[in-house]
């Protein structure tokens, strides 16, 4: 019985094992549950029957397998002789038993060796089972009964061993697991049984086993029960089992793998583990192939043919499947479908779902759907008692909270308002709201919200949400309509089915009619079904296509006036009239299509044709995009009346019937025919097909026309074509082309459209132009129509025509007039244009004798003017401050008179000036008499006048700008003053810069004065060039910028084109300008001024005026001191100026100053150029220059001076300019006086025209033109004036300047000392020392000339005539002009050009400057960025124009070009800078200008503008006092000397003309990026992490170098195009870029060395580069400029903080290429400077240093490219050792300082490493004792 007990124990144990393994929920490998399982098995071992059953089932299975798979070799052998098998197995078993015994030791008490062997085998079997995923598919957990035959067991063990051998790793792991967890549920013993394939025993036993197997085949093994068969089983077992004790022991051990019953479960487990270990050890000898067949215990599949791995996989799959089928769903309770939270009880889940649905706003229906989807499958499979029980218990726990929550929800449900309450609420809402639909929507939403809680409650879940009552949803009208629709459906159901689906009627029409008081909607017509119409069954009138339901008819407002209005009622019935009125402009083109009521039904073919035509017309309507009828004129009158006018301003939609106004008498067919005719002819408008004539407008657009139409419709036009036409080849076809000037393309197109179609629908905005065209070509009907065009109002209710007068007329017409004048000059005086070019050059090349005379006269006159203005400045200033137009006019008149007198005085000097003076006087009269409005009108008129005499225009424009500048300066001192604003406006309009200031005011103080000028010019020329964002007109009209009041005052104050530089020029310059057109244009200008007066504009204007005043000096002062103040302030500025050109410049005092500077520079620079070919031309050039000079110098003076100081400067400038001729006028019209002087000079129309024309051509608007061309002259003059003023301020500079400059400087110094105190503090011009005054003056001139090209203000600031002093003044002016970037630009350019002290030096500098324009072109590029359109506008291809591009006014001469390029470039850079710096102090801009001028000479290419160096220079300028001028000088020296070789002025100019440089790829927003992102971005370029701010700057810098704008990198460009200048430019820029000392040093070097003499101060390089670099952020003004003029710079420095702050802001905050480049340029420049310092460059002149830097860069570039390996590393951003590169460079003879090399590498984004150097340093530090380190550090 012991054996049976053991067997039973083993069987139950195995059965429990199998059972547990069948339970997937229990981990079969967990050893913790083993003891309990064993105990349970032992408890169930009480019955022997159970054990017998196990054995029987085991044997049955064994026999079954044996019988089935006897084919195996081993099986065959076993079957052959059981005895042999048994014996052999016994032997093996004995051996194994012995081993087992040895292993077991004392632990196994009972089992003899024989029984241990079977145990071992069984263990092996179990082990194999463990290794195999054991599943008992049959549920025979206890199948593991001991086999009666030990051999069989042994065999099984062997098989198991073989399996273990084959798969030792997995089996061992599983064996271990199962040894540790013998009862592991997951390991079904049946697999072991299957593994064991014992030889068949007795037949009786086999049968019994088979029977037992049938009983125990269950999916889930049940607990074994004691049965009566126990004895029989026992007997059978005894019979089957050999009597041999060993065998018995074997069988017992095999089946009772555990120790005897008494033994504990732990002992059994231990024994099993040991046995399994033995089996594993012995299993290596056997293989399944040798042992026999192998069957899957789960699916009974024969796996004998499989290797161990495949068998394991198969069994694992079977086990997995069995587990899936047997395992209860683990998530008994589904998780929350909303948040995924698991639950233990259903109630907890239910309560959570409710709460979660409320929190997550999930609707009940959606929640139910989710729950159903989620629980559909899991619930079906999950029903475990354990979980249900746990859920139950836990659910009970949660019942309390759940039940508590339910009542809460019930409360909520109770709280839900009743339906009555909801209805009441809805009703109240509906009463409060006008529309019923909206309340309905809100009601529904409210209702749904109320219903939601109900849906959440169980009680209400079943109830569908209740929709709000219809009573609440719809009003009575809607209900009535619905009822009517239902009835209609009942009555006409068939018809409705065939009709277009009804659309809800729109209430827009009804409301629109009510609001507009239009005729009621047309009466209901018979239903028109689109299906019928589209079927083309017959001709349909247009209104028939209009379905009320599709879109109710929209009737435009009835024309308040016009013929159209009258015919409308009679023409068509109400419906038709409304429909016709409703017609969109496009439909107007096809009005004939069935306008009248449908006539008798035509034939089918006719109907089809008509319907098709209607559809075609409708399609045309869709295609027509023009505001006026695109295809026909039938709807002309009606279209005109109702054009673009719809009730509520809503666009016409749907099928809008054409107007039937034209042919009320005719039937639909007649209208249709006419409509077809009109449509067909309308299609030919501007149609190139068969076109035999072309009309080219001022904008360059070409319109195609057909002569036969013109011949039939407009004989005068065809006559004009025949007379004026010329042949043009386009696309290889020779066609006749006619220039149609003074009219916009739109107007010309509309005119042609009328001729082709007789369409009366004329756009209100074009009525004036159309009227002019109609008058011009004798189309009386069109004239009448234009008169009848109703005054349409814009969205603001402002009359369209009024707005057009302000915007389009002032902008487009005035601009077109300028273009016209330019074209007229071009056509009428081709030679004059050529002469103008020559004259410009000649003007630049003014005779030295004349210049000297001018300087002398200016000095004397300025002294006189200073005295006079000092006396009258207060009165004039008060007048101007009064802001009354009368006072402004009076001042203007006084100034005009003074200027006229001065002009007369100067007449002996220049005969041309007499005319100019006369013109000025006339213009003064014209301008003075009209009030502000008249002045603005005058501006408008001036533009047309300019057309007539470009020369006079240019002169008057120039002169006018001068006055404007003075006025603006005065105004600048009193930015609040209206007069100041007007003056500023006038100045801007006159010079274009002021007009641009208007835009600057409104949008862009940032835009430099040059930009303003150019913008004005462009705006004058092109309506599109409405540079001023606030108002294109305003932009065109200088006055709007400053401020409407100022503009008007200035206009009144000065007859010069106050409204516009062009207008001013026309008025002042030529008698024709004084023609009645002037008043009209003045009015327009005035309207523009009013626009500029708009709050935003006014503020901008005031700001700009202040800034401009700083730039222009005088302009700001007009507010402080009227014309007198201006005059007085000019005495300060002008005193020097007047000293130079006191007598000559009286009238064109400013002009003369401008001329002096320009001409001096031109004479000095462009002596190479022929002296002005004609005295008149010279005078014209002088006049023009004086104009610019006056404007700029005045502005500069004011800018330099504080607001209070500016007026005196302005007066000084006026004195300087007007002393000779306009000492008195200077006071009031000093600014204008200079322009008048220009007019006098320009009085000779041909020459002056030529000069101005050349200028105007580049930028048609005189403002723009004056900024470009006349700006060149003007700018040069202004520069001269400014320079003179600067010289006056800084007598030493003046003395160092040209001999004239010295004289002027002395004179000015006499005067300047007065102005300088104010100017010096505020202006950087003063920074230049006396020695550098000339150089600076040259620098100013050179840059200022380029700038003059770009900006009259800026270029005049650095006028050559002013020489050193003027250069200083211009610098100061530029510095003051931070608001007016043009001034800044001018000064730098001027400085660059004026570097040379002597005239020769100046000439050299000017030549260099001319060559430096490429360098200077950079700043001009910014100007062009703002005003680049001007260039394309100029019809005349002029070098000056190109130069203007580079330096807006480079038309004058190479030197002027240089100055202009530099100035324009400086101006542009300031223009860009102005965005930021304009807010800054004027000194900042001046410094910037000086710096940029220096930069310009070095590299005044666009790169410099983009370079942060330029911006930094601007800031540095503010920081740096006189140093700033030296940088300009340095560039002039470098630029003047090298520029010749580097001269690419035209290219640079072209660049300037290009649109603003904008990166093709927008710069990422580095400023707002997170630090990790910035680090990653830097890592891409191999840059180590830096502080966030530095990373931002560095990334921006990298972006600038890696993402090119239209041009290559600014520095690269400047370096490549201007190798010599680039390095200096970079340095200058670097110094400019918050490197005051560096920039100052360069400027000083250039100023000191000039071309040669001004360099002495070059060595005075201060540590500024680094210092400024550090101060790039702080913008501390380093006042270490070697020049002694630094004190004035200091004053500027005081102002610097604001502009610098703005610059810093732009650098920090803006992702613009400018700021990033500025930082990079700054660093680059600093590196160069430091390198230069290291190399002892301090002793080298600025120009030499620039040349060296450029050469060094080029050498480095060439060297890197010559080394393929190094170049590849550079291209791939692979770092290379810096020290190695330095060593290689030294070996190759390239000596480059470390700092310069670093700067070069950083500038070009070349990745390098200094790891070796750092390691060495670290090692050295480690070696050094700490004390030494400290000492070294100290």
UniProtKB/Swiss-Prot annotation:
The free-text function statement in the UniProt record for this protein reads:
Regulatory subunit that interacts with and increases the activity of different structure-specific endonucleases. Has several distinct roles in protecting genome stability by resolving diverse forms of deleterious DNA structures originating from replication and recombination intermediates and from DNA damage. Component of the SLX1-SLX4 structure-specific endonuclease that resolves DNA secondary structures generated during DNA repair and recombination. Has endonuclease activity towards branched DNA substrates, introducing single-strand cuts in duplex DNA close to junctions with ss-DNA.
Q: Where is this region: Interaction with MUS81?
A: 1328-1648
Q: Which InterPro entries match?
A: BTB/POZ_dom, Rad18_UBZ4, SKP1/BTB/POZ_sf, Structure-sp_endonuc_su_Slx4
Q: Annotated region Interaction with SLX4IP, ERCC4/XPF and MSH2: where? A: 1-669
Q: Which domain of life is it from?
A: Eukaryota
Record-listed Phosphoserine modification sites = 169, 287, 1028, 1044, 1070, 1121, 1135, 1185, 1464, 1469, 1610
The record's disease note says:
Fanconi anemia complementation group P: A disorder affecting all bone marrow elements and resulting in anemia, leukopenia and thrombopenia. It is associated with cardiac, renal and limb malformations, dermal pigmentary changes, and a predisposition to the development of malignancies. At the cellular level it is associated with hypersensitivity to DNA-damaging agents, chromosomal instability (increased chromosome breakage) and defective DNA repair. Some individuals affected by Fanconi anemia of complementation group P have skeletal anomalies.
Listed Low complexity bias regions: 95-104, 1351-1362, 1706-1730
Basic residues compositional bias, start-end: 395-411, 1338-1350, 1654-1672
| Consequence when changing residue 787 to K | Does not modify the functional properties of the protein
Keyword Repeat present in the record's keywords: the answer is yes
Q: How does it assemble?
A: Forms a heterodimer with SLX1A/GIYD1. Interacts with ERCC4/XPF; catalytic subunit of the ERCC4-ERCC1 endonuclease. Interacts with MUS81; catalytic subunit of the MUS81-EME1 endonuclease. Interacts with MSH2; component of the MSH2-MSH3 mismatch repair complex. Interacts with TERF2-TERF2IP. Interacts with PLK1 and SLX4IP.
Name the segments for region: Interaction with PLK1 and TERF2-TERF2IP: 684-1834
Q: Where in the cell is it found?
A: Nucleus
Q: What is this protein called?
A: Structure-specific endonuclease subunit SLX4
Coiled-coil residue windows: 801-870
Specify which residues bind Zn(2+) 2 according to the UniProt entry for this protein. 336, 339, 352, 356
Q: Which UniProt keywords apply?
A: Coiled coil, DNA damage, DNA recombination, DNA repair, Fanconi anemia, Isopeptide bond, Metal-binding, Nucleus, Phosphoprotein, Repeat, Ubl conjugation, Zinc, Zinc-finger
- So where does Zn(2+) 1 get bound? 296, 299, 314, 318
